[in-house]
Amino acid sequence: MSIHIVALGNEGDTFHQDNRPSGLIRTYLGRSPLVSGDESSLLLNAASTVARPVFTEYQASAFGNVKLVVHDCPVWDIFDSDWYTSRNLIGGADIIVIKYNVNDKFSFHEVKDNYIPVIKRASNSVPVIIAAVGTRQNEELPCTCPLCTSDRGSCVTTTEGIQLAKELGATYLELHSLDDFYIGKYFGGVLEYFMIQALNQKTSEKMKKRKMTSSFHGIRPPQLEQPEKMPVLKAEASHYHSDLNNLLLCCQCVDVVFYHPEVTGVVEAHKIVLCSVSHVFMLLFNVKSPADIQDSSIIRTTQDLFAINRDAVLPGASQEAPSNPPLPVIVKDALFCSCLSDILRFIYSGAFQWEELEEDVRRKLKDSGDVSDIIEKVKCILKTPGKINCLRNCKTYQARKPLWFYNTSLKFFLNKPMLADVVFEIQGATVPAHRAILVARCEVMAAMFNGNYMEAKSVLIPVYGVSKETFLSFLEYLYTDSCCPAGIFQAMCLLICAEMYQVSRLQHICELFIITQLQSMPSRELASMNLDIVDLLKKAKFHHSDCLSTWLLHFIATNYLIFSQKPEFQDLSVEERSFVEKHRWPSNMYLKQLAEYRKYIHSRKCRCLVM
């Protein structure tokens, strides 16, 4: 027998005495006397910076012989990146633990706004524990006036935690530290109580099944076997950051060149990427005006660091299109210009790896004061208008932004004429776009714009065989690395477009979306829906979506009694029909045995246990 626990939320960074990272779940598993398993054997699947699995998985033994499986996910962005797996794990949980740090309102609101709605939809009345971890810093007696109740500072109050627990019907705990008392006796006592409850419920259900099978001494009804397991589709890992890094390294579609008269060489870049991360570059390239930004520090940073010089002649810069040469920009600070290649690599990598940037700058500049000055200028470039510079504490920022933070900012330029250098003509409408993003994210587009094709020199490019809505969804994926189809039909159209432009990861996303939508439909909806499942299968095969076509065949076989009654079932090929008949559920053998059993029951005038 096993117990499955799902832990969600970020309780903050905690450490063992030997400076090894720990947390609420791992500390409990390592210290509880009821849980067996040494420290090294607990962790089965640690999150790495490359693969980024959704959950960290722990396995141990509890109460002697009970298998304990814990899945822990501290970051919502990673949880949301594979919602197919995440939803299934929450749906199968016996206990859910929600945790946050009382000194970090960001982690509390992440739990409240993101995790709680998912739990409400997916969980089936399983016990929930809300753990508020940490001791509040600078906590004062709360003011009761209306002006103060709107904002309690950076600490999460007890009232807010209790209110969240009431909303979910959960048990609320405050753990001031991760010591033996709070972990072993307080948190552990509550968790082990719910574990015993779950074991009792599972044992009771098992005993009921045994009583039902042993109560009938005549001919036993036929046993309905479980349907075959559906093929599992694994999502392709994102290569968004490497795509834009390669764009910087290959110097394709360059439209801006930075230089300093006293520094040899130039630094090439792309306006669209720079503007997606910085209002300084938006102001420099006239994407926004000073009136739009309304932040004197950003305006001052732009004027102090950069100046456009359209008359400059730069023989060292690559000029792929002589008719539209890159824009020359003077960098007024020579030291900043000498480190600009490292700064751009930092920006193109997501602008969160501050420690690596500081090391790169320190290798070039020996003076620590100069290094601090350069880092401070980078922070000013990335500042958000009208807000205090949130990048003061780089380590905190790095911990909260492990993924790209400007993939959503690129959406600001989607289907907008700002900085656009190519226009697609679709169904009589025009869609502006940016060659740099298209070349970086799509190999077919890169070959089209860089080869000896008409599109390489043309600004207006016609697109055939795709609707405007589908093509806009395709561009949205290229710009943001995500998409959300409106339904199965649009997902199939987007899959066809992705196959046409050979974007394999988008194909996998569409496949997972279609599979998830079909799996979530109840039998009654499957029977009444107008969607032609056989036509969907044939399209998947025609467009080389092997994973989806194989899954659809298994889906038709598993729901044989529904789809065999539909007229399109006759459109299956001989090979497909043979596969469906072989793997159908329920099987022909079971239906024959059931008919014989019914006949026997009616002949003896007994009560049928099956029906």
Curated annotation (Swiss-Prot):
Gene3D superfamilies: P-loop containing nucleotide triphosphate hydrolases (3.40.50.300), Potassium Channel Kv1.1, Chain A (3.30.710.10)
Keyword Lyase: no
Keywords: ATP-binding, Golgi apparatus, Hydrolase, Nucleotide-binding, Repeat, Transport
Domain of life: Eukaryota
Start and end residues of each stretch annotated as Interaction with Rab9: 420-611
Species assigned in the record: Mus musculus (Mouse)
Phylogenetic placement of the source organism: Eukaryota, Metazoa, Chordata, Craniata, Vertebrata
GO biological process: male gonad development; retrograde transport, endosome to Golgi
Protein name, per record: Rho-related BTB domain-containing protein 3
Annotated ranges, domain BTB: 254-356, 420-487
Enzyme class: hydrolase
Assembly and oligomerization: Interacts with RAB9A and RAB9B (at lower level compared to RAB9A-binding). Interacts with M6PRBP1/TIP47.
InterPro entries per record: BTB/POZ_dom, P-loop_NTPase, SKP1/BTB/POZ_sf, Small_GTPase
Gene name, Swiss-Prot/TrEMBL: Rhobtb3
Location of the region described as Rho-like in the Swiss-Prot/TrEMBL record: 1-175
GO cellular component, one term: cytosol
